[in-house]
Regions:
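Non-cysteine beta-strand/loop elements that form the S-adenosyl-L-methionine
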Residues: 141
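Portal/gating segments that form or line small-molecule/metal binding sites
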Residues: 1-134, 144-185
Length: 185
């Protein structure tokens, strides 16, 4: 069974919203970590907001030229997009709409053979899938920055969930990537 790994940026005070604030922390080490996790995956799982942002960037000549094989991989991987408002056909290459019972659709995807699926941010989708026990690992890129306001990674009222720390990676710029597996229920 393939897993679902979430990768998301967060400030020290728990804010994930509009991660443009993370750009000053990008480094060669961060790029290598991002590359490794992308190559360990054979599909992307995205919510509508993340899909729209990525679809507007990754397929452009500018991004392909700048990001090289990383952009090529982002563009070529199958992308499964959870949305109630988007309509098919989706514009970004190899994108598939999950419009019905998303938890059921994702559970079926997990049963397919292959590598793990990677989910960037897509926090509302992450919350919904966590409620159904479908998220396997959460990789939090903790930035040494306090934003003071914005949407938090874990909303009030979310079900208590036990996590097990399985890996930490400290990048030279002070970002710490914390990898947590969802503990057995």
């Amino acid at each position: 069974m393939r897993g679902i790994n979430v990768s998301t940026y967060v400030s020290l005070d728990g804010v994930f919203e509009d991660p443009a604030w993370s750009a000053p922390y990008w480094s060669d080490a961060a790029q290598q970590f991002a590359r490794d996790q992308l190559w360990e995956s054979d599909a992307l799982l995205l919510g509508r907001t993340t899909y729209e942002a990525f679809a507007a960037s990754w397929p452009t000549e500018e991004w392909i030229e700048r990001e090289g094989e990383f952009a090529e991989r982002m563009n070529s991987l199958p992308k499964y997009v959870a949305s109630t408002s988007l309509e098919e056909p989706l514009e970004w290459n190899n994108s598939h709409l999950l419009k019905g019972d998303v938890a059921q659709d994702v559970a079926k995807l997990k049963e397919e053979p292959g590598q793990d699926m990677l989910m960037y941010s897509s926090v509302e989708l992450m919350h919904a899938l966590m409620e159904h026990g479908l998220i396997d690992e959460v990789r939090i890129w903790l930035h040494p920055l306090i934003l003071g306001s914005g949407k938090h990674l874990f909303k009030d009222g979310i079900e208590k969930t036990e996590l097990e720390l399985v890996d930490t990676t400290t990048l030279p710029n002070g970002v710490v990537v914390l990898a947590y597996q969802i503990a057995a229920r």
